[in-house]
UniProtKB/Swiss-Prot annotation:
Residues 13-29, 41-54 have a biased composition (Acidic residues). The gene is SWC5. Belongs to the SWC5 family. InterPro entries: BCNT-C (IPR011421), Swc5/CFDP1/2 (IPR027124). The keyword Endoplasmic reticulum does not apply. Component of the SWR1 chromatin remodeling complex composed of at least ACT1, ARP4, RVB1, RVB2, ARP6, YAF9, VPS71, VPS72, SWC3, SWC4, SWC5, SWC7 and SWR1, and perhaps BDF1. Keywords: Activator, Chromatin regulator, Nucleus, Phosphoprotein, Transcription, Transcription regulation. Residues 217-294 form the BCNT-C domain. Present with 1680 molecules/cell in log phase SD medium. GO terms for cellular component: chromatin; cytosol; nucleus; Swr1 complex. This is SWR1-complex protein 5. One of its GO terms (biological process) is chromatin remodeling. It is found in: Nucleus. Residues 1-12, 55-72, 200-211 have a biased composition (Basic and acidic residues).
Length: 303
């Protein structure tokens, strides 16, 4: 087939219109929209680029963002753990560099002076107390000496349950054991009168026997042997328990309590309670008499 040639013949009228057209005089001319459209075209063109390049550009933009000026709700900057740790270490190492010496106010000086005066007064009072303690120690020594003078030495040698017991101790004179020991000494002091008379009688008899005929002497009495110490006395269970009770009373400090609650004290308290009860009965009887008298008087007035 023969090739057909096509030729485009320009329209002369259109060319003339284009030559006489002024863009700025056109009513639809808006350069701002054209710029926006051009920007959109550029953006469209950029969107049409490679995906890999777009990702790289975005990462670069993210790295360039400065987050140091972002503030939290509490007002401070957002800090990482490493930043907080660095700040704490810096504060520990430089904590004494920020100290400032301030002038001491007058009130603090006055308080310091008051404390110094109080310490001086305390020292003076303590020195006075030391002197009083020394004086008290002297008085205590004198009282201990007086107490030692009031104490007595108890020496006992007796045989109980087949064993010989030797006792030697210091006790106060006013204690129960001391009183019992003193009573036993009184008994011993009163007892030797009879042996002396017996000795005199034996001597007279011996003299008479020498004059006449010598007879065998009688065996000396047991009481004399006990007093002289040749024969140790045997304690009965009752006497031993009495000694043990007296020593226990002194050791436990029950002497005053026993004196307070003895039989005489109990009887005295019973008498006191009886007197109080009788006084209450008398008062009750007196009040009853007054009530009866008032009732009789009211009955007589009513009649």
């Amino acid at each position: 087939m023969p090739e057909v040639e096509t030729k485009i013949i320009p329209n002369e009228k259109e060319d003339e219109d284009e030559d006489g057209y002024i863009e700025e005089e056109d009513e639809d001319f808006q350069p701002e929209k054209d710029k926006l459209g051009g920007g959109s075209d550029d953006s469209d063109a950029s969107d049409g680029g490679d995906d890999y390049d777009d990702g790289v550009n975005r990462d670069k933009g993210r790295n360039k963002v400065d987050y140091s000026r972002i503030e939290s709700e509490s007002g401070g900057l957002i800090k990482t753990r490493r930043a907080r740790q660095a700040e704490e270490e810096y504060a520990k190492t430089h904590k004494y560099e920020s100290l400032t010496v301030e002038s001491i106010p007058a009130k603090v000086n006055s308080i310091w002076e008051e404390l110094q005066e109080a310490s001086k007064n305390r020292l003076l009072s303590s020195s006075g107390k030391v002197g009083s303690v020394l004086d008290g120690s002297k008085e205590a020594r004198s009282t201990t000496a007086a107490q030692q003078e009031d104490k007595i030495l108890i020496e006992r040698n007796y045989k109980f349950a087949g064993e010989t017991v030797h006792e030697k101790k210091w006790v106060s004179r006013s204690s129960a054991e001391g009183q019992e020991y003193l009573n036993s000494l009184k008994f011993k002091q009163q007892a030797p009168a009879a042996p002396v008379q017996l000795e005199k009688a034996v001597r007279t008899k011996s003299n008479e026997s020498r004059q006449h005929l010598r007879r065998p002497l009688k065996r000396p009495p047991l009481l004399e042997q006990i007093i002289s110490g040749g024969l140790r006395p045997k304690l009965t269970t009752l006497e031993k328990s009495q000694l043990d009770w007296a020593s226990y009373v002194d050791r436990a400090g029950l002497n005053d309590e026993l004196v307070l609650h003895n039989k005489d004290g109990f009887l005295a308290r019973q008498e006191f309670l009886q007197r109080v009860g009788s006084a209450e009965d008398e008062r009750y009887k007196e009040l009853r008499r007054q009530q009866l008298a008032q009732q009789l008087q009211q009955d007589s007035e009513a009649s």
